[in-house]
Amino acid sequence: MKSTGGNEVQKAGKSQVKVGRQNKTIITNTMYTMGGMLLMNGVLQLVIYPLLNRQMGAEQLGNLLYIMGLVSILCPSVGQSLNTSRLVVRRDYPVTNGDYDWTILIFGVVGSAAALGCSGKELHTPSAYLATFLLLMITIFRYYGDVEYRLNLNYKRYFIYYLMISLGYLGGFFLYRASGSWFLIFLVGESLALLYVGISGTVFRGFFSRSASFSVVIHRGLFLTLSYLITNTTLNMDRLVLNRLMGNVAVTEYYVVSLIGKTMVLLIAPVNTIVISYLTKRRETLTKKQFLKGVAAGLGVSALFFLFCEIATPIFIRLFYGNLYESVKGLIMVTNLTQILGLLSAFLFILVLTFTDERWQLWLQAAHFVLLLVLAAAGTKAFGILGFAWASLAANCLRVGAVILLGVAKARKG
């Protein structure tokens, strides 16, 4: 009996050590992922874009932001969705690198052609069209490329991946100063990351080898890509609607006032990657109780992020875009709240994705997109940029409520 009791204590001790190590690993991985995103976005938002604002002015920067808006819509929609899809599908199908590499290539070419068609009057020369096409394709593969480190839970290399992008942006800026082409900033950054994953990883090896699961990858990936496409179009709705209805200066103004909030949204993305990486390794799905705990945690973190944004946004605008502060100060609170609710819904969607069919996410995203488009167009026409801000807030409130209801309805009992 004593021996049995001793064994039980020993097993309990080993179990606690194992849990402690796992928690430490999760914290370390979170630091690496958030550190990588902070570094990349810090270089962009604190160095590259403020310097471009001084070089170009609000009108030309608005043109650049519109083109980069197309990049921000298409590239994560294809690259990140297939990245996430691979983590989920691997549990049920023996997929290969080539299955996903081919899918990215097909979706990327079709999507890039569509994005060029949406560029309208913002691209003026054949070289600008070519540079935009190259930027779209390279960035799509870059968004997918970090799946190498998510599959293996190697978040130290994930950090280095984003370090390469940051260094590339800085190097590309010097090439921009010499050539006058801002495309070089982003082409160099994205290409350097792909070079790193090509050297350190295997995710692009066996590019042309497809398995019997290829059709599954196409089918599952298409639904998730469409869902991400709707989400990212929604996130960049300001650039599309304001560009069409008010012009490039309004695009720059809303970009500046929403920047801190959008950076918070970007920061939650790597946390989401860790969440889905660990949850998809489990055989059992979340219970209603576990999902609601996730909702509560998301609400708490979102409240803290909102307070931070309210303090940081005015300081940031005065420091880096002082010439625009007076024209945007009335937008700060409503815009920050809009972005933080977007952050919360993105986190909740990741939780829901682990125990529901991808089509549910697609339908909810589509409904939110249509609602936002209608409200934003009407609000902007009636009240200008302030009308757009309030319309966006209303749509995001409804989105958060809808995804919580879906999670409660679909999570297993317990």
Where are these regions (language model features)?
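Hydrophobic alpha-helical transmembrane segments
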Residues: F159-G206, L371, I385-A409
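N-terminal membrane topogenesis motif
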Residues: M1-V43, S200, F208-L224, V403-G414
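Interfacial segments at transmembrane-helix termini and the short loops linking adjacent helices
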Residues: A58-L61, S119-L135, I311-L343, L386
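Membrane-interface junctions at transmembrane-helix termini in multi-pass inner-membrane proteins
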Residues: S85-Y93, T139-I160, L337-L364
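Helix-loop junctions and terminal segments of transmembrane helices
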Residues: Q45, Y49, C75-P94, K262-T285, ...
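Transmembrane helical elements of multi-pass membrane transporters/channels
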Residues: N29-N41, Q45, M164-I165, W182-V197, ...
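Signature of the first transmembrane helix
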Residues: K2-G5, Q22-S77, L222-V249, L372-A377, ...
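Membrane-water interface segments that mark the loop-to-transmembrane alpha-helix transition
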Residues: T28-N41, Y66-L123, E284-F308
